[in-house]
Amino acid sequence: MTAPSSQVRRAALPDEEPGDAPLRLLLAGVAFAAGLTGLFLLVWPGSTGRYFSWVLDPPPLASLIGGSYVASLFVFGAALRRPWSEVRGLVAGTLALTIPMLSVTFFHLEVFDFGRWQAWAWVLLFVASPLSFGTILWLRRGSPFADDGPLPPAYRIISGLLAAVFSVVAIGLWWDPVETARVLPFELPSFGGRVLGCWSSFLAFLGGWAAIRARAKEVQVPLLGIAWFMAGAIGGALRNFGDLGPTGRRAAYLLVLGTLLVLSLASWRAAKVSASRL
């Protein structure tokens, strides 16, 4: 005997597990809000005082963060139809972004004009986000991890290297963003630099998850996420190419971003090939 077709279809859908509907809704909300915000930052990087939660200067920084938001649209959008075992790393990674972001926000409240709704929206977002994603992680803490093939050792090392690079960047930006910005082709204000450090800690977590978990299916979303964020950073740099600093520093900046993009894409590809052999 064969199972009814409706049961077969249910078994084939990755979102039929209990609790998946709220997760999909949350991922979709992040993708939509991030994509819209990123579009504004890329199109009008010099006018953030009119529509953003705080004045995000200089324009190259606004475009860089805008590119990160657009990357979030693709990363969280792609996660919508993935099973929990494959998006767990991304969901956990949001805490590495939102908890530090909430901390630096309260450390720099002076940059916000709380007479504007956008300022309140920023604070509420970074209060609600870790609570929402943290609750999902807690409720699904007993869910099994993916049972699949390993990430090839060389790419596990590369993932660890990516995590180390982004960790160093995050620590430097949190500790002294103005001094750390000396290696960049644009200046960083204190709050803007620390916000960028929060994005770096998010990417460090994704790389670390891939290196530690090292399961072919489980690491694909985190590794592809790093690649998307590097592509977004390159897009942001090209958007304000003329505003970037000295030629040598500008070239080195793009070279580093391109190298990180290639390494993350190569690792994602290796994970995908390894998973397809099962």
Predicted regions and their residues:
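Juxtamembrane "helix-exit" motif on the non-cytosolic side of transmembrane helices
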Residues: 43-50, 106-114, 173-181, 236-244
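Membrane-interfacial loop-to-transmembrane alpha-helix junctions, especially the N-terminal start
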Residues: 23-28, 84-94, 156, 217-225
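Short, intrinsically disordered terminal tails adjacent to the first/last structured region
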Residues: 1-13, 276-278
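Hydrophobic, ordered structural segments
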Residues: 71-144, 150, 236, 246-274
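Hydrophobic alpha-helical membrane segments
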Residues: 92-105, 199-203, 222-238
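Surface-exposed interaction/gating patches
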Residues: 20-39, 142-213
